[in-house]
UniProtKB/Swiss-Prot annotation:
Residues 78-98 form a coiled coil. Signal peptide: none annotated. The keyword Coiled coil applies. This is Coiled-coil domain-containing protein 32. Interacts with AP2S1; the interaction is direct and mediates association with adaptor protein complex 2 (AP-2). InterPro entries: CCDC32. Residues 159-185 are annotated as: Disordered. Keywords: Ciliopathy, Cilium biogenesis/degradation, Coated pit, Coiled coil, Membrane.
Amino acid sequence: MKMFESADSTATRSGQDLWAEICSCLPNPEQEDGANNAFSDSFVDSCPEGEGQREVADFAVQPAVKPWAPLQDSEVYLASLEKKLRRIKGLNQEVTSKDMLRTLAQAKKECWDRFLQEKLASEFFVDGLDSDESTLEHFKRWLQPDKVAVSTEEVQYLIPPESQVEKPVAEDEPAAGDKPAAAEQ
């Protein structure tokens, strides 16, 4: 490789001279093997010959260069890019399974709430039998226990009565506290 003159030199050269000197140091592209550095993608349309070309009856030889035309798959590629852009921007209109499940859960909740609020709805299922309020409450409790108030029987079952064993133990505790004080005196 050639050594360039230092920046201290007083002689000024034109840009063309500098480029000529730089390019002379580079290898000549015509000397290299073309097969090793060849670009592999040809950008040639994959459709068979004759489909995209205009056929001219008078000429036996058609020109090798075709006028520019979009590739067959360019519409698909553009559609995929537009889809990605919509997804990135948050404008995606496709319904995902997560959205479907959320919508169905909301609809189910609204249906149950509407059903449980209507007292006449239970009569449709009983078919003429007289149902009292306790039957409806029992049915509501079975469907949605968190929506129905706790009955007095359930409260009594949940809160155990205080046992008689705990009261004497509570009375013995102050007496036990007095004994160590008496022992210290």
